[in-house]
Amino acid sequence: MFTLNRIARLSLLFISMNIACAHAGEISADYIRGEGDVEGIKLAYRFDILKTYDFDPRIKVYAESSVNFWKYGTPEHYDSNFVVSISPVLQYTFCECMEGELYGEVGIGLSLLDDTEFAGKDVSTHYQFEDRLGVGYRFGEAQEYSIALRYFHYSNAGFKKPNPGLDFISFSFSKAY
Protein backbone atom coordinates (compact mmCIF):
# COMPACT_ATOMS: atom_id res chain seq x y z
CA MET A 1 0.00 0.00 0.00
CA PHE A 2 1.36 3.40 -0.94
CA THR A 3 1.50 5.91 1.88
CA LEU A 4 1.45 9.66 1.45
CA ASN A 5 5.21 9.71 2.06
CA ARG A 6 5.80 7.22 -0.76
CA ILE A 7 3.66 9.25 -3.14
CA ALA A 8 5.55 12.42 -2.21
CA ARG A 9 8.87 10.66 -2.73
CA LEU A 10 7.82 9.27 -6.10
CA SER A 11 6.64 12.73 -7.13
CA LEU A 12 10.00 14.21 -6.16
CA LEU A 13 11.79 11.54 -8.18
CA PHE A 14 9.71 12.09 -11.30
CA ILE A 15 9.97 15.88 -11.02
CA SER A 16 13.75 15.55 -10.93
CA MET A 17 13.59 13.16 -13.90
CA ASN A 18 11.45 15.62 -15.89
CA ILE A 19 13.91 18.44 -15.21
CA ALA A 20 16.61 16.13 -16.50
CA CYS A 21 14.72 15.39 -19.73
CA ALA A 22 16.01 18.63 -21.22
CA HIS A 23 19.34 16.80 -21.58
CA ALA A 24 20.21 13.67 -23.51
CA GLY A 25 19.67 10.82 -21.12
CA GLU A 26 20.38 7.24 -20.26
CA ILE A 27 18.02 4.72 -18.68
CA SER A 28 19.37 1.95 -16.47
CA ALA A 29 18.09 -1.19 -14.76
CA ASP A 30 20.19 -2.77 -12.00
CA TYR A 31 19.98 -6.07 -10.17
CA ILE A 32 21.09 -5.47 -6.58
CA ARG A 33 22.48 -8.00 -4.12
CA GLY A 34 23.20 -7.12 -0.49
CA GLU A 35 24.31 -8.77 2.71
CA GLY A 36 22.53 -11.99 3.60
CA ASP A 37 19.38 -12.55 1.56
CA VAL A 38 18.93 -8.92 0.48
CA GLU A 39 18.21 -8.34 -3.19
CA GLY A 40 16.40 -5.79 -5.28
CA ILE A 41 16.16 -3.68 -8.38
CA LYS A 42 17.18 -0.13 -9.15
CA LEU A 43 15.68 1.89 -12.01
CA ALA A 44 17.62 5.02 -12.89
CA TYR A 45 17.70 7.96 -15.25
CA ARG A 46 21.05 9.64 -15.97
CA PHE A 47 21.92 12.87 -17.73
CA ASP A 48 25.24 14.57 -18.45
CA ILE A 49 26.26 17.49 -16.27
CA LEU A 50 29.64 17.97 -17.93
CA LYS A 51 30.06 16.76 -21.48
CA THR A 52 33.32 15.11 -22.40
CA TYR A 53 34.34 17.73 -24.96
CA ASP A 54 34.00 20.52 -22.37
CA PHE A 55 37.01 19.28 -20.42
CA ASP A 56 39.02 16.09 -20.87
CA PRO A 57 37.51 13.59 -23.35
CA ARG A 58 38.07 10.78 -20.83
CA ILE A 59 36.09 12.49 -18.05
CA LYS A 60 32.31 12.60 -17.87
CA VAL A 61 30.15 13.89 -15.02
CA TYR A 62 26.51 12.83 -14.87
CA ALA A 63 23.62 13.05 -12.43
CA GLU A 64 21.48 10.04 -11.64
CA SER A 65 18.01 9.96 -10.13
CA SER A 66 16.79 6.52 -9.17
CA VAL A 67 14.19 4.47 -7.41
CA ASN A 68 15.16 1.27 -5.57
CA PHE A 69 13.04 -1.63 -4.36
CA TRP A 70 14.80 -3.89 -1.84
CA LYS A 71 13.56 -7.14 -0.29
CA TYR A 72 14.87 -9.42 2.40
CA GLY A 73 13.93 -12.81 3.78
CA THR A 74 11.39 -15.47 3.02
CA PRO A 75 7.63 -15.16 2.48
CA GLU A 76 7.14 -16.09 6.16
CA HIS A 77 9.59 -13.43 7.39
CA TYR A 78 9.63 -10.73 4.70
CA ASP A 79 11.01 -7.20 4.82
CA SER A 80 11.09 -4.59 2.06
CA ASN A 81 12.28 -1.05 1.55
CA PHE A 82 11.66 1.65 -1.02
CA VAL A 83 14.43 4.19 -1.74
CA VAL A 84 14.78 7.26 -3.95
CA SER A 85 18.21 8.73 -4.67
CA ILE A 86 19.92 11.50 -6.55
CA SER A 87 23.66 11.43 -7.08
CA PRO A 88 26.36 13.19 -9.10
CA VAL A 89 28.85 10.69 -10.56
CA LEU A 90 32.35 11.17 -11.97
CA GLN A 91 33.19 8.71 -14.73
CA TYR A 92 36.66 8.18 -16.22
CA THR A 93 37.32 6.21 -19.43
CA PHE A 94 40.44 4.07 -18.95
CA CYS A 95 40.73 2.83 -22.51
CA GLU A 96 38.99 2.37 -25.80
CA CYS A 97 39.17 -1.35 -26.50
CA MET A 98 37.26 -4.05 -28.41
CA GLU A 99 35.15 -1.37 -30.14
CA GLY A 100 34.00 -0.03 -26.76
CA GLU A 101 35.13 1.92 -23.72
CA LEU A 102 36.22 0.60 -20.32
CA TYR A 103 35.45 3.08 -17.52
CA GLY A 104 35.49 3.54 -13.76
CA GLU A 105 33.23 5.76 -11.68
CA VAL A 106 32.78 7.23 -8.21
CA GLY A 107 29.96 9.22 -6.67
CA ILE A 108 28.34 10.38 -3.46
CA GLY A 109 24.67 11.30 -3.42
CA LEU A 110 21.62 11.53 -1.18
CA SER A 111 18.95 8.90 -0.59
CA LEU A 112 15.62 8.79 1.14
CA LEU A 113 14.65 5.41 2.66
CA ASP A 114 11.04 4.50 3.36
CA ASP A 115 11.97 2.43 6.44
CA THR A 116 14.92 2.92 8.81
CA GLU A 117 14.80 -0.72 9.90
CA PHE A 118 15.65 -3.19 7.17
CA ALA A 119 17.24 -6.64 7.00
CA GLY A 120 17.78 -6.75 10.74
CA LYS A 121 19.55 -3.38 10.84
CA ASP A 122 18.47 -0.04 12.30
CA VAL A 123 20.07 2.71 10.19
CA SER A 124 18.50 5.46 12.38
CA THR A 125 17.59 8.02 9.72
CA HIS A 126 15.50 8.07 6.57
CA TYR A 127 18.15 10.26 4.92
CA GLN A 128 21.30 8.41 3.89
CA PHE A 129 24.35 9.09 1.78
CA GLU A 130 24.73 6.83 -1.25
CA ASP A 131 28.41 6.14 -2.00
CA ARG A 132 29.36 4.24 -5.14
CA LEU A 133 32.40 2.78 -6.83
CA GLY A 134 32.08 0.97 -10.14
CA VAL A 135 33.57 -0.28 -13.38
CA GLY A 136 31.78 -0.62 -16.68
CA TYR A 137 32.00 -1.15 -20.40
CA ARG A 138 30.25 1.02 -22.99
CA PHE A 139 29.58 -0.50 -26.43
CA GLY A 140 27.40 -0.35 -29.55
CA GLU A 141 27.63 1.60 -32.81
CA ALA A 142 27.32 4.92 -30.96
CA GLN A 143 28.48 3.61 -27.54
CA GLU A 144 24.80 3.69 -26.51
CA TYR A 145 24.83 0.52 -24.37
CA SER A 146 26.63 -0.04 -21.11
CA ILE A 147 27.08 -2.82 -18.58
CA ALA A 148 28.53 -2.07 -15.15
CA LEU A 149 29.41 -3.66 -11.83
CA ARG A 150 29.05 -1.29 -8.86
CA TYR A 151 29.49 -1.31 -5.10
CA PHE A 152 27.02 0.86 -3.13
CA HIS A 153 27.21 1.85 0.53
CA TYR A 154 24.37 3.64 2.31
CA SER A 155 24.96 5.36 5.64
CA ASN A 156 24.06 8.53 7.54
CA ALA A 157 27.77 9.44 7.98
CA GLY A 158 27.49 9.15 11.76
CA PHE A 159 24.93 11.93 12.20
CA LYS A 160 22.83 9.61 14.34
CA LYS A 161 23.54 6.28 16.06
CA PRO A 162 23.32 3.44 15.29
CA ASN A 163 24.87 3.72 11.86
CA PRO A 164 25.67 0.19 10.63
CA GLY A 165 25.27 1.09 6.96
CA LEU A 166 23.93 -1.07 4.15
CA ASP A 167 26.18 -2.54 1.44
CA PHE A 168 25.19 -3.71 -2.04
CA ILE A 169 26.74 -4.98 -5.26
CA SER A 170 24.81 -4.23 -8.45
CA PHE A 171 24.92 -5.39 -12.04
CA SER A 172 23.59 -2.77 -14.42
CA PHE A 173 22.50 -2.55 -18.04
CA SER A 174 21.79 0.86 -19.55
CA LYS A 175 20.90 2.49 -22.85
CA ALA A 176 21.61 6.08 -23.85
CA TYR A 177 19.09 8.09 -25.90
Describe every region a protein language model picked out.
Residues 37-41, 80-86, 125-131, 165-169:
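Residues that define the transmembrane beta-barrel architecture of outer-membrane proteins
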Residues 1-24:
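Cleavable N-terminal export/targeting peptides
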Residues 30-31, 73-77, 118-123, 156-159:
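Extracellular loop and loop/strand-boundary signature of outer-membrane beta-barrel proteins
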Residues 33, 47-49, 53, 92-94, ...:
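Residue-level signature of outer-membrane beta-barrel architecture
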Residues 25-29, 57-65, 84, 102-108, ...:
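Transmembrane beta-strands of outer-membrane beta-barrel proteins
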Residues 43, 139, 165-177:
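Outer-membrane beta-barrel "beta-signal"
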Residues 22-24, 50-59, 95-102, 141-144:
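Short loop/turn motifs that connect adjacent beta-strands in outer-membrane beta-barrel proteins
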Residues 31-37, 47-49, 65-71, 108-114, ...:
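Transmembrane beta-strands of outer-membrane beta-barrel pores
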